[in-house]
């Protein structure tokens, strides 16, 4: 990188591969950022030498510039569990991973089921956040599954969706009412698809490995029964339904069939569901304990097919920080969850290297598709606006080392894994929020 007398946030990227699926753009181009404003994208940008002296000129050959990534499913733990993560540390982890927006789940303490908590989260994000924070409100008051939260109040204060994530809405009538109510406010309802009667006491995927280990399993039906119910309710109400963390082949099939009938449903999965299989638990390593559980090889392949054919719209991390005490204990008592903000990008790019996804498809899963699902004008490169983009090297080789993560927690099962693909710079709101480039 040629720095010279560059002014703050003046950058000229030369010969970058610019991928913006929302604009159907995938081309080699120069990219100009002037005073933090994304000013131009075209094959060759010539600046007079006296003006060029005020820019950092970066040879971006073989690198990508993409819209700032969006993770539509994270747990920032604030308020109430700041020993696991805070808005400050979680959003720093996000920009280190290439993300410029994160949607945070409502299972905080107190639960985000009212305007006061939503407003608190947004205020903390303004004060200490490093990227955009998108609060998701609760479906039910206190996540108790008894009565609906005030969706209008939640949306009015800044919530972008509603969910009881971390637990299902077990009462079918309440879920129906939630979909009908949310439709009035054009809010998607995010379903944590789990039948609690079928999953009760389960510690991992039900199958040969759970039998061998003597661990109580969670059958695929625990997810699929609830997916089927919620698809039926979405079809009945015409409301927008989003299925979170899809993990089974049966769920992929049902979602695909529902889409073909015109049901207004979208879906996400997480990197661990297309990367890991349940035999990883043979060592009883609690880093692999997550809900829904890591499944078998056939499910992994089905998830990949669902991503490729568009059945699964988005990849979200389900970033779920936990303290070492909560993970370093007997398997039965260990908390469920994996952090993912700083490990997701190389795992997603592996789908490109193995030709499951094209580069444009992969970028869409973490940019314009989540933005579309949440109904937000994000996930695209907007000219003459404050730069919100990610500069990445898809072939950057490194070993994932959770001891260097910006997240407060270390529960990452990919620690020590050699991998490729990393964010080099993350621009948010016209500023460099994170950079790995030398000064």
UniProtKB/Swiss-Prot annotation:
Family matches, as Pfam families: Amidohydro_1 (PF01979)
E.C. number(s) listed in UniProt: 3.5.2.3
GO biological process, one term: 'de novo' UMP biosynthetic process
UniProt-recorded Gene Ontology molecular function terms: allantoinase activity; dihydroorotase activity; zinc ion binding
Catalytic activity annotation: (S)-dihydroorotate + H2O = N-carbamoyl-L-aspartate + H(+)
Residues the record lists as binding Zn(2+) 1: 73, 75, 165, 318
PANTHER family: ALLANTOINASE (PTHR43668:SF2)
Function (record text): Catalyzes the reversible cyclization of carbamoyl aspartate to dihydroorotate.
Family: Belongs to the metallo-dependent hydrolases superfamily. DHOase family. Class I DHOase subfamily.
Protein name: Dihydroorotase
Source organism of this protein record: Syntrophobacter fumaroxidans (strain DSM 10017 / MPOB)
Gene: pyrC
